[in-house]
Amino acid sequence: MKLLEQIEKWAAETPDQTAFVWRDAKITYKQLKEDSDALAHWISSEYPDDRSPIMVYGHMQPEMIINFLGCVKAGHAYIPVDLSIPADRVQRIAENSGAKLLLSATAVTVTDLPVRIVSEDNLKDIFFTHKGNTPNPEHAVKGDENFYIIYTSGSTGNPKGVQITYNCLVSFTKWAVEDFNLQTGQVFLNQAPFSFDLSVMDIYPSLVTGGTLWAIDKDMIARPKDLFASLEQSDIQVWTSTPSFAEMCLMEASFSESMLPNMKTFLFCGEVLPNEVARKLIERFPKATIMNTYGPTEATVAVTGIHVTEEVLDQYKSLPVGYCKSDCRLLIMKEDGTIAPDGEKGEIVIVGPSVSVGYLGSPELTEKAFTMIDGERAYKTGDAGYVENGLLFYNGRLDFQIKLHGYRMELEEIEHHLRACSYVEGAVIVPIKKGEKYDYLLAVVVPGEHSFEKEFKLTSAIKKELNERLPNYMIPRKFMYQSSIPMTPNGKVDRKKLLSEVTA
């Protein structure tokens, strides 16, 4: 697959097809090509001998997509920076990346950045004055050159720049289109901010198939009335989101086939897909295919997938995350560095062309997490799991296991069983510390329909069900009830915010 050529094909074949929609703003494939060409021409003329990455700042504006393509056509990787990212973190990204330029789709609120800033108005001038100019195709990003760099959280407090090459992205996009049976001209949900690599799961599969990206922003998500009004207008056929976001949508009774009658495919990544969420989606969207996938940012979005059916749900209490894409392989490594046999738990290691070339400007971190196995790049994920008959089962983060009163336990396992209880719509387990040790587990629960007059009676009923599924030491000591679970801008459960709320 020639990625950029495939996207540009639609500018010639279906120039008036909408490529991207956000609120009242939209762009066609013709506009996408013309404006990204103009921008690439300007970048090449301003920085003829430079290949430093370019920061792209904004939220869900159509100009974000134009800027991404303009950067790579000029031979520069782009760094998506969402406006929700704190100023200090943006500053660190600018310093770590060595970027010299920032393209902005909206007003930049961060001051004293060590980069040249091109404002929204400046961009419009560039699109106009350089219209009709085409960049030299030889300059475009290719092969093992970086296509994008996404910054993720680092344990040291400094963000890590994950470098994803052109070849990495082509490998992912080709697999996604083929394995998920994506068709030409479909409407894709774009829920994840561009600084979160889940967004890559919809951007490039949509653009290479001549589809339309339907973007929803954080303000819509905060106002359910606006969110569902937008979804009703969208005619989305391919849904890409975290399971948490879908779970939130399922709390609205009208979120069903009647709202989105042409829904074909649900693609989930970024979190564990709870069985209960998958069951509800099958009930509400009986004609749609539900795909559960797995992969870290360092391995280009996702490397495994499985079609979740009623049979799969009946067979497994916790859903498997799928079979590995054909050009990669999975190894399960034991603590002693040997490969675990089928069915035995260990650390998930991903090998193959999806694997990043490492963290930008961080050789020590790169050496710790990445290695070479049989001449191919490999990434040590820090995730626990096992493989049975080629099927990968995810068992949470190795560092997400806690020891409570001498017992080692997986918080995600407890959450799985808690969500399966009657009267529970959503739930998160928060481990509470006393000094340096964990003291007890707190369950934060969004209750479903019930007739209990007192909270303690509801808690007793939930605990009774949990006792049938979990040993006593894994039952949360305390329960807290809320109307919703806080989420990060990326659509994942905001565990830090929850912890600060419950310990305040």
From Swiss-Prot:
<protein>
    <recommendedName>
        <fullName>D-alanine--D-alanyl carrier protein ligase</fullName>
        <ecNumber>6.2.1.54</ecNumber>
    </recommendedName>
</protein>
<feature type="binding site">
    <location>
        <begin position="152"/>
        <end position="153"/>
    </location>
    <ligand>
        <name>ATP</name>
    </ligand>
</feature>
<dbReference type="InterPro" id="IPR010072">
    <property type="entry name" value="DltA"/>
</dbReference>
<feature type="binding site">
    <location>
        <begin position="394"/>
        <end position="397"/>
    </location>
    <ligand>
        <name>ATP</name>
    </ligand>
</feature>
<comment type="similarity">
    <text>Belongs to the ATP-dependent AMP-binding enzyme family. DltA subfamily.</text>
</comment>
<dbReference type="InterPro" id="IPR042099">
    <property type="entry name" value="ANL_N_sf"/>
</dbReference>
<feature type="binding site">
    <location>
        <begin position="292"/>
        <end position="297"/>
    </location>
    <ligand>
        <name>ATP</name>
    </ligand>
</feature>
<feature type="binding site">
    <location>
        <position position="383"/>
    </location>
    <ligand>
        <name>ATP</name>
    </ligand>
</feature>
<keyword id="KW-0436">Ligase</keyword>
<dbReference type="Pfam" id="PF13193">
    <property type="entry name" value="AMP-binding_C"/>
</dbReference>
<keyword id="KW-0067">ATP-binding</keyword>
<feature type="binding site">
    <location>
        <position position="197"/>
    </location>
    <ligand>
        <name>D-alanine</name>
    </ligand>
</feature>
<dbReference type="InterPro" id="IPR020845">
    <property type="entry name" value="AMP-binding_CS"/>
</dbReference>
<dbReference type="GO" id="GO:0005524">
    <property type="term" value="F:ATP binding"/>
</dbReference>
<dbReference type="GO" id="GO:0047473">
    <property type="term" value="F:D-alanine [D-alanyl carrier protein] ligase activity"/>
</dbReference>
<feature type="binding site">
    <location>
        <position position="492"/>
    </location>
    <ligand>
        <name>D-alanine</name>
    </ligand>
</feature>
<dbReference type="GO" id="GO:0070395">
    <property type="term" value="P:lipoteichoic acid biosynthetic process"/>
</dbReference>
<feature type="binding site">
    <location>
        <position position="301"/>
    </location>
    <ligand>
        <name>D-alanine</name>
    </ligand>
</feature>
<dbReference type="InterPro" id="IPR010071">
    <property type="entry name" value="AA_adenyl_dom"/>
</dbReference>
<comment type="pathway">
    <text>Cell wall biogenesis; lipoteichoic acid biosynthesis.</text>
</comment>
<dbReference type="GO" id="GO:0005737">
    <property type="term" value="C:cytoplasm"/>
</dbReference>
<dbReference type="InterPro" id="IPR044507">
    <property type="entry name" value="DltA-like"/>
</dbReference>
<dbReference type="InterPro" id="IPR045851">
    <property type="entry name" value="AMP-bd_C_sf"/>
</dbReference>
<dbReference type="Pfam" id="PF00501">
    <property type="entry name" value="AMP-binding"/>
</dbReference>
<dbReference type="InterPro" id="IPR025110">
    <property type="entry name" value="AMP-bd_C"/>
</dbReference>
<feature type="binding site">
    <location>
        <position position="492"/>
    </location>
    <ligand>
        <name>ATP</name>
    </ligand>
</feature>
<keyword id="KW-0963">Cytoplasm</keyword>
<keyword id="KW-0547">Nucleotide-binding</keyword>
<dbReference type="InterPro" id="IPR000873">
    <property type="entry name" value="AMP-dep_synth/lig_dom"/>
</dbReference>
<comment type="function">
    <text>Catalyzes the first step in the D-alanylation of lipoteichoic acid (LTA), the activation of D-alanine and its transfer onto the D-alanyl carrier protein (Dcp) DltC. In an ATP-dependent two-step reaction, forms a high energy D-alanyl-AMP intermediate, followed by transfer of the D-alanyl residue as a thiol ester to the phosphopantheinyl prosthetic group of the Dcp. D-alanylation of LTA plays an important role in modulating the properties of the cell wall in Gram-positive bacteria, influencing the net charge of the cell wall.</text>
</comment>
